[in-house]
């Protein structure tokens, strides 16, 4: 390790006094090294750091929640909980909030969005999609990683004494974060060292390479692995560490009031930045005594001014305005401390800017100062305290800057550490646009949700079908999942055909047939596949008979009696040619004596022997293609709902087969409200919706008719069993209903109010993120995915040519 330039011997009581022994007489003075400048003594594997001889600290990383987008009521709740969080810390605990923005190696992000060529006929659109993802990644600032930490320290005689106390505080902090709905976890020694390494090497791309075993092998210390090549604190206003320029500043709070957006504005900068808020609680009795003393001093000064006024012959009530103002503020603070559950804290807010060049550094500091000025504060450089400022920016909970501001709990809590959540997951994650607040790419894996079922909701022209097609394309390129589409409007076949999928056209004139009586031996969990199949047949018959209030018990019993007879031949010898059809059920019903059986058979007659007999055939299409589209546009009004229900049963067949092969099945249902509109189909659809997750199915309902969807009695079950909602622009009446149903704040609601195509809100579990997605219209994929009539016409012309 290259050592720093020789420095003057630190004076007694100076900053470095605690890190050295005083040289003996005639002993050559030791050179001050970079490692000795880093202000801690030991870093344990468990994350406990001995900062000074009797000072120990631990660090907890915490994540963001949607504070800026929350409803005012929720904001107030979060703010009050944050105040309670701060009040937890008594005078024996120092703590430091660290907010670190640093550039990351983009290769990590590129790995997540990487789509490799497969050397097949789809490589042209596959690589086009991959290029689009790279362009979207470049638009955001995903290369800038934002992390948040809280570090707390206590005084103890030994690590044995410190450890149980630190662990108890850590548990309390994690529980307090849980109350706030914030994910958090404690850091181990390696993770804490990595933060310091990244602070010292912010402008470098070299990864942190360290393990405690290497210390034993090499005889080096932890500091040797994190230290830069050199420190240079020549100038009083900035410094250098290695080849990186840096400047440490503090926030001078001049404004009488601050907003809860102040910290968010600083953290929104797209430059390397470390914001450290050091907080030391003051003993409550001492704080009250201090304020009372100040009030006494102010009253004494007021009396002196009044005496002076009397001697001078003017009104004794006329006193300096500052004196009156300070007196009123002091009394208010005293009242807060005594009766409003407020504490007093000594707070230091530090900023560490770094850059590759002096010019870039000055620009970054200027930008930071501009934000401070916006809130009537000033950003002051730590003149001749640059080293202390840098070292105090390390998450060690040891403030070496002697500049503190006394603030009450509420005033301290105004630095709310929460802004907006990000969603960028690894694994089988798919692209869902850019975060409308941070401009970062949204990558999410629905399989990681407790319930991956989803809805895509939007008005006509908002981009709902396009969004579904984009997800289908992404699934096809990056996973091995099967994809099935129920297409009542004939909008999906261009994409499905382009991806080598199978389009099954079902209509009264089509020669493509699917048999509603199809079953496989894996149809249900138990050894009785007929049990669940009977639910479907009953729903089918209810729909055919128009039984709005359901079928009579006698009618259900008759059907239930017939089903084992109808399926007996197939179950004894499961060959495709032995699969029964609706005609077999019809014949069996005719053989029964009950009038209910004859009534059902009469209702079935038009579907068996009449003009609507399209579903009375053996399935004559192969259903083993990876991507299948059931085009039921030409079925007509009488058969469309029936067709959607039958397609849903075919999908269930596929799901049960895929489950045994441990394969997921994605099912997209356009015009989903049609299945929920009728009581006969709604109950069965909801039952399937609930069962899909357990069997590896991932259904997605797509609709523009929100009123019809929300009018269904079953919508509560759909929402409760859907952890993924992709909400685009909504009509006025629908917005209010959805806001109440999903607890959407007015601010969040603005993202689905008169929003542009491809803009809205993404609900992923408990995370709500506003998104925007402007797809490049020049891409070949766009032509395959668009649903605009004029653009779809161009696709047809190209295909025919």
Residue ranges and their predicted role:
Residues 2-418:
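Extended, folded cores of ATP/NTP-driven motor/assembly subunits in large transport
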Residues 65, 72-91, 98, 102, ...:
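P-loop NTPase motor domains
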Residues 456:
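Hydrophobic anchor at the beta1->P-loop junction of P-loop NTPases
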Residues 459:
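P-loop (Walker A) phosphate-binding loop of NTP-binding proteins
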Residues 462-515:
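Walker A/P-loop NTP-binding active-site region of P-loop NTPases
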Residues 483-486, 629, 666, 692, ...:
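Structural recognition of the conserved hydrophobic beta-strand(s) that form the central parallel beta-sheet
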Residues 500-504, 714-727:
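A short helix-turn-beta junction within AAA+ P-loop NTPase domains corresponding to the substrate/partner-engaging
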Residues 742-797:
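Conserved P-loop NTPase
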């Amino acid at each position: 390790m290259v050592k720093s330039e020789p420095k003057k011997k630190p004076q007694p009581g100076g900053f470095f006094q605690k890190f050295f022994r005083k040289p003996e007489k005639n002993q050559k003075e030791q050179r001050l090294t970079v490692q000795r400048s880093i202000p801690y003594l030991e870093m344990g594997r468990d994350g406990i750091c001995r900062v000074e001889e009797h000072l120990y600290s631990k660090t907890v990383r915490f994540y963001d929640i949607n504070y800026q987008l929350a409803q005012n009521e929720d904001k107030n709740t979060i703010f009050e909980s944050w105040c309670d969080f701060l009040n937890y810390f008594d005078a024996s605990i120092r703590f430091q909030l660290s907010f670190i923005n640093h550039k990351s190696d983009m290769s990590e992000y590129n790995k997540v969005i990487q789509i490799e060529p497969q050397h097949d006929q789809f490589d042209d659109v596959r690589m086009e999609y991959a290029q689009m993802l790279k362009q979207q990644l470049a638009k955001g600032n995903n290369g800038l990683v934002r992390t948040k930490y809280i570090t707390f320290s206590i005084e103890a005689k030994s690590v044995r004494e410190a450890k149980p106390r630190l662990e108890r505080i850590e548990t309390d902090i994690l529980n307090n974060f849980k109350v706030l709905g914030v994910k958090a976890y404690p850091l181990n020694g390696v993770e804490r060292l990595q933060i310091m390494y990244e602070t010292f090497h912010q402008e470098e791309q070299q990864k942190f390479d360290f393990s405690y075993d290497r210390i034993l092998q090499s005889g080096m210390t932890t500091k040797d692995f994190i230290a830069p090549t050199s420190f240079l604190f020549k100038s009083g206003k900035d410094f250098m560490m290695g080849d990186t320029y840096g400047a440490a500043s503090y926030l001078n709070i001049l404004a009488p009031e601050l907003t809860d957006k102040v910290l968010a504005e600083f953290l929104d900068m797209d430059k390397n930045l470390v914001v450290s808020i050091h907080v030391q609680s003051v003993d409550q009795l001492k704080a009250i005594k201090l304020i009372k003393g100040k009030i006494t001093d102010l009253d004494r000064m007021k009396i002196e001014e009044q005496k002076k006024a009397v001697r001078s012959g003017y009104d004794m009530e006329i006193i300096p305005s500052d004196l009156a103002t300070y007196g009123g503020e002091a009394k208010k603070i005293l009242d807060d401390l005594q009766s409003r559950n407020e504490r007093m804290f000594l707070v230091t807010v530090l900023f560490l800017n770094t850059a590759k060049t002096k010019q870039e550094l000055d620009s970054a500091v200027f930008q930071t100062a501009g934000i401070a000025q916006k809130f009537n504060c000033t950003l002051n450089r730590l003149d001749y305290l640059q080293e202390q400022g840098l070292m105090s920016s390390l998450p060690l909970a040891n403030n070496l800057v002697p500049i503190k501001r006394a603030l009450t709990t509420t005033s301290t809590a105004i630095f709310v550490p929460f802004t907006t959540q990000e969603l960028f997951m690894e694994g089988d994650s798919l692209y869902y646009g850019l975060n409308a607040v941070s401009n970062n790419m949204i990558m999410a894996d629905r399989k990681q949700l407790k319930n991956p079922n989803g809805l895509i909701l939007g008005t006509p022209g908002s981009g709902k079908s396009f969004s579904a097609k984009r997800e289908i394309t992404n699934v096809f390129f990056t996973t091995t999942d099967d994809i099935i589409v129920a297409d009542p409007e004939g909008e999906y076949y261009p994409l499905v055909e382009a991806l080598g999928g199978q389009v099954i056209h079902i209509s009264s004139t089509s020669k493509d047939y699917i048999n509603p009586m199809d079953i496989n031996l894996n149809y249900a969990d138990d050894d009785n596949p007929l049990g669940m199949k009977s639910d479907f047949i009953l729903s089918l018959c209810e729909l055919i008979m128009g039984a709005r209030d359901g079928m009579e018990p006698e009618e259900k019993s008759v059907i239930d009696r017939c089903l084992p007879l109808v399926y007996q031949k197939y179950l004894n010898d499961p060959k495709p040619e032995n699969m029964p059809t609706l005609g077999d059920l019809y014949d069996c019903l005719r053989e029964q004596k009950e009038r209910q059986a004859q009534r059902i058979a009469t209702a079935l007659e038009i579907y068996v022997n009449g003009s609507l007999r399209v579903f009375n055939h053996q399935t004559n299409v192969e259903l083993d293609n990876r991507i299948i589209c059931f085009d039921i546009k030409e079925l007509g009004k009488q058969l469309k709902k029936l067709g959607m229900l039958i397609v849903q049963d075919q999908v269930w067949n596929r799901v049960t087969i895929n489950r045994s092969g441990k394969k997921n099945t994605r099912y997209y249902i356009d015009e989903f409200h049609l299945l929920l509109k009728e009581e006969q189909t709604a109950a069965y659809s909801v039952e399937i919706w609930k069962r899909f997750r357990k069997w590896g199915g991932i259904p997605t309902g797509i609709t523009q008719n929100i009123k019809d969807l929300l009018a269904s009695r079953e919508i509560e079950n759909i929402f409760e069993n859907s952890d993924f909602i992709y909400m685009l622009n909504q009509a006025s009446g629908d917005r209010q209903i959805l806001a109440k149903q999903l607890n959407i704040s007015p601010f969040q609601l603005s993202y689905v109010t008169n929003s542009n195509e491809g803009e809205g809100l993404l609900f992923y579990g408990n995370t709500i993120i506003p998104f925007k997605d402007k797809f490049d219209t020049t891409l070949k994929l766009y032509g395959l995915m668009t649903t605009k009539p004029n653009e779809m016409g161009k696709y047809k012309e190209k295909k025919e040519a």
